[in-house]
Structures are given as structure tokens and as C-alpha cells.
Amino acid sequence: MFWALLFTFLLTQRKKMDFTLRTYRKLLVALLHKGYRFITFEQYCMLLPSQRRERFVILRHDVDLKAENSLRIAQIENELGICASYYFRIVPDSNKPEVIRAIAELGHEIGYHYEDMSIMQGDVDKAYTHFQEQLAYFRQFYPVRTICMHGAPTS
């Protein structure tokens, strides 16, 4: 049902893909009007199996580049009463402490978008140490409980 709704919504957007914030807001509002509840990945992990039958959207953002754009998205979600999961990398385009802090203060989940094996060129021991250090870094902004791998082949 969700995918059918999303597909129909996208088709009505002037027959072209429209990735503007205005259209994103419209999509969120359409899902809210259809009775979907938005939850973070952390919230999903805490659901009982019986609760997983409800209509919900796990809203997750991988912040690979342009962290400032993620803040604008987080503000829109906050205005609509929606919480999402934001996964940040440690690279300069993603790792903007002021943005991470602002998104966390809006009530969104913060997670670590890790790529430690790639950064440490396959050295497992160094990657493990690096992972622990970076996780501690992100935990200064939010009590990180979920992580997701970046798409690098050796992450």
C-alpha cells in the first residue's frame, strides 16, 4: 500500500521527478492524511511484534553530503510533528556539529553512518578502534543506539 501511494503521488507531480522541499512536504502531508505514523529506526527496534502491524513509515536519512540541506528537511518534519532518523558520516560535508546538534534538538534520532573498514583500508583492529572513537564522538550529540553502513564496498 505504501509503495502504491508513493508511486501515485510521484506521478501527480507534473510528470517529472520533483525533489524540492515543497514536494517533500506534500508527500509527508499525504502520508499523514492516509493515516501513516512516522517512527525512527530506534523506535521501530523497540516495537513489539503485534505493534508492527500498524501503518507506519520508518523515516531515515543518510547524510552523505550537504548537511545543511538535512537541517531544512528536519525542520519541515518537525513542523509536521514527524521524527526521523539521521545518519551522519564523519566526512567534512556530513559532519557539521552545529547541524547535528540542531537536528537532535528538533527531536530527531541521530545515528552513525559508518565506513570504518574503508577508512582503515581493511585493517579490522584499526577499524574497530576507529568505530568506537567515532561512535563516542556522535554520542556527544545524541545517545546513539542505531547505526547504518555507508555504501563503500569495504565498509
Q: Which residues does each predicted region cover?
A:
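Catalytic alpha-helical scaffold of carbohydrate-active enzymes acting on polysaccharides/glycoconjugates
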Residues: 2-155
